[in-house]
């Protein structure tokens, strides 16, 4: 296919045009007075969303070069979502502001490589400052504030997530389910999270979230490798097909031929199945499989117990209310029938902790007790319509991720205030430590990082530059509360952001922006020639 090639300023400007279209669509959602975006769906009703990364995924432009700009800035949003789970809109707004400021300087003759170095040094300084100013999250009230802000100023969701974390602990699992009514409820149930994901992506059932989600599945537990299709797999698959229920296989490994058989059955719709490798190694693996068996009411198929896969019956399989498997983890939500067995197993493990000889043994036993007894918080999302349900689930996911991030690295003043204050610190630091084009790079960052506050104010119908000026005159804790249209102490107002979200958004925005500023040439398919 013929190619279209653009150089230097033309190339960078074309990328900027694509970025501008994307950022405008995403940034309307920023802040407490941000608006919604309606997404047309090929199947089903349109989706109304307020989530940056979801909107970013939907945007695809006709112009190939502009679309490249969209793809690049989408990476900043996606990476921030992977690391912190929230702050995607902020990352997008920051990246575009950096590119816009940077292009002016590159066009005026500044060296892009030196600018890139200056931007990276400035970002390192800002990350240190964010970590320094971050306040640890210890009380339920702080957790509630973070969750409420991330869910779009929804105090009910904030209280629900704070309650869930209080019950299952910081490491506990919070799972979302679609409720039957219109009220969103919280339920604590037994369950376990394993640090193992699916063996093959062909098992995925939800392509949007890239995960496998099964309701009411059977669970096959074995410590052996599944290699032979006829002996190991077919007997149990035939029995499962009759029940019309899905199957989770947890085994040491699944060999190529057996894996191909499972995938083929899944793709043909004969049986819904997913396979994961058993967690742990050696003797620990067998013990962890026993723990899962207690949770699910199943039996581990091992040669030690005289059991083999070729004569297995359905009554030896475990059961769960729900399982969620992604590329890294597997969450098993219990059905509530094994509470007494779980308590007995935990008691047995606690006795072993007391007689364990090494600290390693004790640590592993305590880890197993935590996994078994920690439980899972299930939030049943209630809504009037399907469209509202999807929006609520996205907000809840953001809120859960933001809350975890806050517990990890602490909180800073929200509403764009932290970056607006640090902008002035950065100017002082860079003038002392950098020179020439590197200084220009740092000053680009200092001007760009006020963009989120400016956009939050504009979405609230207030003059952005005026708000920035007023905030920068005040102490570090003081910011602009767009929901109430007043200036005040952001910690007291409950407008806080997780430091991890602010940090990762800034780092990813700088990474993408500096790559675009050092671009000298773009090569894309020339669609017009083909026509």
Swiss-Prot record:
Its main location: plastid. This is Chaperonin GroEL, chloroplastic. Forms a cylinder of 14 subunits composed of two heptameric rings stacked back-to-back. Interacts with the co-chaperonin GroES. Keywords: ATP-binding, Chaperone, Chloroplast, Isomerase, Nucleotide-binding, Plastid. The keyword ATP-binding applies. It catalyses: ATP + H2O + a folded polypeptide = ADP + phosphate + an unfolded polypeptide. It is an enzyme of class 5 (isomerase). Transmembrane segments: none annotated. Its EC number is 5.6.1.7. Together with its co-chaperonin GroES, plays an essential role in assisting protein folding. The GroEL-GroES system forms a nano-cage that allows encapsulation of the non-native substrate proteins and provides a physical environment optimized to promote and accelerate protein folding. InterPro entries: Chaperonin_Cpn60_CS, Cpn60/GroEL, Cpn60/GroEL/TCP-1, GroEL-like_apical_dom_sf, GROEL-like_equatorial_sf, TCP-1-like_intermed_sf. Belongs to the chaperonin (HSP60) family. ATP binds at residues 29-32, 86-90, 415, 481-483, 497. It comes from the Eukaryota. HAMAP family: CH60. CDD domains: GroEL. GO terms for cellular component: chloroplast. SUPFAM superfamilies: GroEL apical domain-like, GroEL equatorial domain-like, GroEL-intermediate domain like. NCBIfam families: GroEL (TIGR02348), PRK00013.1 (NF000592), PRK12849.1 (NF009487), PRK12850.1 (NF009488), PRK12851.1 (NF009489). It is found in: Plastid, Chloroplast. One of its GO terms (biological process) is protein folding. GO terms for molecular function: ATP binding; ATP-dependent protein folding chaperone; isomerase activity; unfolded protein binding. The keyword NADP does not apply.
């Amino acid at each position: 296919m013929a190619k279209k090639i653009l150089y230097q300023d033309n190339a960078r400007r074309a990328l900027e045009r694509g970025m501008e279209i994307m950022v405008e669509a995403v940034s309307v959602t920023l802040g407490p007075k941000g608006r919604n975006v309606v997404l047309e769906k090929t199947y089903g009703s349109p989706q109304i969303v307020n989530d940056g990364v979801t909107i970013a995924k939907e945007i695809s432009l006709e112009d190939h070069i502009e679309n490249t700009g969209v793809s690049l800035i989408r990476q900043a949003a996606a990476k921030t979502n992977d690391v912190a789970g929230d702050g995607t809109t902020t990352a997008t707004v920051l990246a575009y502001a950096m590119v816009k400021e940077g292009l002016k300087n590159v066009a005026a003759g500044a060296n892009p490589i030196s600018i890139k170095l200056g931007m990276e040094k400035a970002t390192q300084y800002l990350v240190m400052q964010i970590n320094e100013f971050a306040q640890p999250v210890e009380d339920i009230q702080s957790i509630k504030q973070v969750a409420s802000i991330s869910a779009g100023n929804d105090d009910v969701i904030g209280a629900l997530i704070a309650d869930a974390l209080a019950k299952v602990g910081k490491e506990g699992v919070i799972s979302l389910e679609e409720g039957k009514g219109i009220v969103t409820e919280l339920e604590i149930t037994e369950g376990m999270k394993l640090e193992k994901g699916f063996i093959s992506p062909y098992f995925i059932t939800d392509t949007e979230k890239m995960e496998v989600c099964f309701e009411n599945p059977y669970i096959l537990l074995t410590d052996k490798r599944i290699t032979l299709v006829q002996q190991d797999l077919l007997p149990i698959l035939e029995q499962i097909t009759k029940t019309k229920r899905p199957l989770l296989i947890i085994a040491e490994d699944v060999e190529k031929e057996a894996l191909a058989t499972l995938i083929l059955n899944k793709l043909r719709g004969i049986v819904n199945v997913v396979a994961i490798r058993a967690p742990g190694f050696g003797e620990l693996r067998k013990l962890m499989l026993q723990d899962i068996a207690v949770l699910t009411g199943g039996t581990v198929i091992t040669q030690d117990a005289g059991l083999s896969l070729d004569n297995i019956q359905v009554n030896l399989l475990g059961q769960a209310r729900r399982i969620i498997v992604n590329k890294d983890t597997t969450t098993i939500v219990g059905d509530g029938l094994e509470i007494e067995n779980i308590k007995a197993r935990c008691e047995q493990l606690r006795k072993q902790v007391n007689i364990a000889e090494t600290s390693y043994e004790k640590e592993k036993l305590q880890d197993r007790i935590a996994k078994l007894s920690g439980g899972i918080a299930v939030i049943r999302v209630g809504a009037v319509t399907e469209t509202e349900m999807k929006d609520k689930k996205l907000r809840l996911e953001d809120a859960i991720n933001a809350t975890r991030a806050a517990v990890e690295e602490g909180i800073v003043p929200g509403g764009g205030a932290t970056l607006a204050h640090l902008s002035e610190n950065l100017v002082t630091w860079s003038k002392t430590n950098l020179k020439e084009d590197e200084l220009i790079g740092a000053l680009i960052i200092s001007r760009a990082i006020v963009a989120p506050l400016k956009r939050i104010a504009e979405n609230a119908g207030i003059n952005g530059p005026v708000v920035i000026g007023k905030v920068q005159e005040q102490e570090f804790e003081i910011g602009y509360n767009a929901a109430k249209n007043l200036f005040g102490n952001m910690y007291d107002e409950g407008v806080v952001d997780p430091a991890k979200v602010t940090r990762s958004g800034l780092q990813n925005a700088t990474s993408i922006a500096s790559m675009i500023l050092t671009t000298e040439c773009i090569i894309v398919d020339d669609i017009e020639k083909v026509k």
